[in-house]
């Protein structure tokens, strides 16, 4: 079982630092900020292996009317759900919002869902895929509707975001963390700092797609594996999923950390 109350209080303390950040307060008065927290399914804590998917930053997540931690956490806990999971992805899969966006349109969510469905088959999980996995982002705060992480926000708060993600790892305790944040020379920097924060050790680099165009970097830290790959946008999705699954299956079958 996940100790939700302790998890919540640990995160609340860190989100409060964002809410009193002078630069973020100035930004929020001109351009709305949105906040997100990691989501997990009802069956996640009892699942083996436990898989957490990570993106860079969420655009269009919860947007508070005022920048205050009590609005984020008190009452209905608008950005942290107790096992609510990602049912919303299935519920809105092909239903455009007011901006015309829907999860089925996103390569990121297509790969996430496809991989989760394959994990259900592989490990005989009996219910819907979203009950068994978790999803979050490196950056917990972003400019609303920004299509990519705001470097203005992210670069000065890397350490704080790393501390937040470390809390996620402590309470959710995933066996595998899938980082769709970039693994090439020009994109790897996004997750490099966090892997250094954990003293992670690279154990493998698996090529996928012809001519070694893309790779999945495999790291080990604190009893869990991190698979760092490219964002699915513009990449072959089926081979991406297939390569990830082969890595997970091999490590889960042979590694004593399970």
Regions found by a protein language model. Name each.
Residues 2-172, 176, 182, 186-188:
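A polyanion-binding, active-site-adjacent surface
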């Amino acid at each position: 079982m996940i100790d939700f109350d302790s998890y919540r209080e640990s995160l609340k303390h860190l989100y409060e630092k964002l809410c009193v950040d002078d630069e973020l307060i100035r930004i929020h008065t001109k351009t709305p900020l949105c906040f997100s927290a990691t989501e997990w399914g009802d069956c996640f804590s009892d699942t083996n292996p436990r898989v957490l998917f990570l993106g860079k930053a969420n655009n269009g997540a919860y947007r508070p009317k005022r920048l205050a931690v009590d609005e984020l956490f008190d009452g209905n806990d608008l950005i942290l759900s107790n096992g609510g999971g990602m049912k919303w992805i299935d519920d809105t899969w092909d239903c455009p919002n007011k901006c015309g966006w829907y999860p089925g349109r996103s390569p990121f969510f297509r790969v996430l869902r496809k991989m989760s469905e394959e994990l259900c088959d592989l490990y005989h999980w009996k219910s819907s895929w979203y009950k068994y996995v978790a999803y979050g982002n490196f950056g917990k705060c972003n400019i609303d509707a920004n299509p990519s992480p705001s470097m203005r926000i992210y670069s000065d708060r890397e350490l704080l975001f790393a501390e937040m993600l470390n809390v996620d790892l402590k309470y959710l305790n995933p066996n595998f963390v899938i980082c769709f944040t970039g693994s090439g020379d020009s994109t790897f920097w996004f997750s490099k700092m966090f892997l250094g924060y954990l003293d992670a050790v690279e154990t493998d680099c698996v090529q996928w797609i012809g001519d070694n165009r893309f790779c999945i970097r495999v790291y080990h830290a604190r009893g869990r594996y991190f698979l760092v790959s490219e964002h699915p946008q513009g990449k072959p999705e089926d081979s991406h999923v297939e390569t990830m699954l082969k890595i997970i299956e091999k490590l889960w079958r042979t590694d004593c950390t399970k």
